[in-house]
């Protein structure tokens, strides 16, 4: 019986330690969505001006290098940070939110990869 109580207490403490509040989750999700929305907006502005869109090469930048669109960054979950315009793949300091963010980035990157050529 003591083992059962210990197991319940350990499981509860582990769940509490890794639990993320709904505010943290919604903040991380909205940040990820805004990053991919900015890709669409940047590309639309180029097309509106009637300019020939610059040829972006898919997976041409490594983490920490300067970028313009998410599809330039190598890695399934790598994105082009919207403030410094560098490739990064970390979303949050919380490991659960970071894993969720990386999964969401991978989904978004599968869409934004059409902005870059595969050269």
Curated annotation (Swiss-Prot):
Gene Ontology molecular functions: ion channel regulator activity; toxin activity
Sections of the chain in a coiled coil: none
Disulfide linkage: 59-74, 67-80, 71-116, 73-87
Record carries keyword Lipoprotein: no
Known tissue expression: Expressed by the venom gland.
Record carries keyword Disulfide bond: yes
Superkingdom, taxonomy of origin: Eukaryota
Key words of the record: Disulfide bond, Ion channel impairing toxin, Knottin, Secreted, Signal, Toxin
Compartmental location: Secreted
Residues in the signal sequence: 1-19
GO CC, any one term: extracellular region
Protein family: Belongs to the neurotoxin 25 family. ICK-8 subfamily.
Domain notes: The presence of a 'disulfide through disulfide knot' structurally defines this protein as a knottin.
Main function: Ion channel inhibitor.
Protein name per UniProt: Toxin ICK-8
Organism: Trittame loki (Brush-footed trapdoor spider)
């Amino acid at each position: 019986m003591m083992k059962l109580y210990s197991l319940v207490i350990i499981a509860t403490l582990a769940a509490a330690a890794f639990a993320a509040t709904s505010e943290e989750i919604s903040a991380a999700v909205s940040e990820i969505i805004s990053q991919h929305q900015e890709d669409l907006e940047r590309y639309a502005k180029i097309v509106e001006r009637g300019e020939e869109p610059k040829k972006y090469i898919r997976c041409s930048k490594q983490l920490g290098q300067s970028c313009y669109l998410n599809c330039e960054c190598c890695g399934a979950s790598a994105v082009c940070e919207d403030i410094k315009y560098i490739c990064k793949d970390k979303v949050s300091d919380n490991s659960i939110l970071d894993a969720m963010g990386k999964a969401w980035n991978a989904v978004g990157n599968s869409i934004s990869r059409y902005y870059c050529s595969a050269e």
